[in-house]
Regions:
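Charge-rich, well-structured scaffold segments of protease-associated domains
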Residues: 2-14, 62, 66, 76-270, ...
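Short acidic-hydrophobic surface loop/beta-edge motif
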Residues: 31-37, 275-285
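Short Gly/Pro-enriched turn/cap motifs at secondary-structure boundaries
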Residues: 22-24, 284-287
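Short, N-terminal intrinsically disordered low-complexity segments that are rich in Pro/Gly
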Residues: 21-23, 59, 63, 67
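Short glycine-rich loop/turn motifs
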Residues: 31, 40-43, 54, 184-186, ...
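Active-site scaffold of zinc-dependent metalloenzymes
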Residues: 45-61
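N- or domain-start disorder-to-order transition segments that initiate the globular core
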Residues: 2-49
Length: 355
């Protein structure tokens, strides 16, 4: 049984305001939603006896173009910080920490930085490195981080052609070479033409070179603020101690500001009639074009704030497409409609959709 006393001490912390507290029976966890009063940061705690402790901080990072700014920033903030001025602290943590999970992910509308460890001292250090990275990154004094992770020109000799290089630029060239990936991204862009989802948060290689260092810095200054963040703590730990440390080392140094108007995600209004679009992708001469056509049918399904609908479509996705011998998938294959049937329920954005 999760120890409720762990969260009783949290209620006594003057730096925080508790807005909700519940017991989650399925996970034997006591959960609490809080707000850091000075900075406006939101925190969700799940206290239980799981020794695998989890922390993440996430920011709403809606892109207004397809330069891949959120993705490049995700790479860049873990390239050194004020407190940890080493070249690549992320790699050092991969090699030298006791982490059970360590990553950073860019989504179409948010960027998250999760870590986990069973060792409390190691867990505390992981939190420190990640928080200093996202809030106090070296990008302000080291423009070369942007050039390395984003894009830059290269010229080996005067006789060579000018080329473009960069970690994210090359990564997204690879992503855009996959027809399934191209179709998935294009589907989302077409379904939500009037919202941030019409842009490619990961970056379109054709557009990435339009990103400037000045816009890159402005994006971090605007969105990477505690008031635009959500912090998550899970597992067997002294929650009051962790929150006190968060306040003293990081959150308490920030004043609340209104980030929500800029980072708010607009809702796409329904189309008056079904929309059809076509897109092409590259193939080699050896591959040819025979049997290389893809067809996708997608529909928006409510919002991610509807838990019953969410569960229903998770079940439908498994039953119709992903289960062994799934009925819809097998029927389509038997009818000769396609060589293979892919699909599913994408529920990682404000308006989930089924394809």
């Amino acid at each position: 049984m999760a120890d409720g006393r762990n969260l009783e001490k949290v209620k006594e912390l003057a730096a925080y305001r508790v807005s909700e507290e519940i017991y989650v029976e399925e996970m034997d966890s006591r959960a609490m939603v809080l707000e850091h009063i000075k900075s406006g940061a939101r925190i969700f705690l799940m206290s239980n006896e799981d020794e695998n402790k989890v922390f993440y901080i996430g920011f709403r990072t809606p892109p207004d173009d397809s330069t891949g700014l959120p993705h490049i920033l995700e790479h860049s903030v873990l390239e050194g910080s004020d407190k940890f001025p080493v070249k690549d602290p992320f790699v050092e943590l991969v090699k030298g920490s006791l982490n059970t999970f360590l990553n950073a992910m860019t989504y179409p509308d948010k960027t998250v930085y999760p870590v986990a460890s069973c060792n409390d001292k190691d867990f505390q250090n992981l939190m420190d490195v990640y928080l200093d990275g996202v809030l106090h990154p070296a990008i302000y004094r080291e423009p070369k981080i942007f050039l390395q992770e984003g894009w830059h020109y290269e010229l080996e000799s005067p006789e060579d052609e000018l080329t473009i290089n960069g970690v994210v630029y090359n990564e997204m060239k690879g992503a855009f070479s996959s027809p399934e990936s191209v179709l998935d991204r294009f589907t989302r862009n077409v379904l939500f033409p009037d919202t941030t989802y019409s842009n490619e948060s990961g970056g379109d290689p054709a557009v990435i070179p339009q990103l400037t260092y000045e816009k890159f810095i402005a994006f971090h200054r605007n969105y990477y603020h505690p008031a635009n963040s959500y912090i998550y703590l899970y597992g067997d730990m002294d929650m009051a101690q962790k929150l006190t440390w968060l306040d003293q080392e990081y959150l308490g140094h920030y004043d609340r500001k209104d980030c929500h108007a800029d980072s708010a995600i607009a809702t796409q209004q329904p189309f008056e009639q079904p929309v059809q679009r076509e897109i092409t992708y590259s193939v080699t001469e050896e591959e040819g074009t025979k049997d290389r056509t893809y067809l996708s049918i997608s529909t928006v399904v409510g919002t991610d704030l509807e838990p019953v609908l969410y569960v229903a479509f998770q079940i439908l996705e498994y039953t119709l497409i992903n289960a062994p011998g799934a009925t819809l998938k097998q029927a389509l294959i038997d009818a000769g409609i396609g060589q293979d049937i892919l699909g599913g329920y994408d529920c990682g954005i404000l308006q989930p959709y089924f394809s």
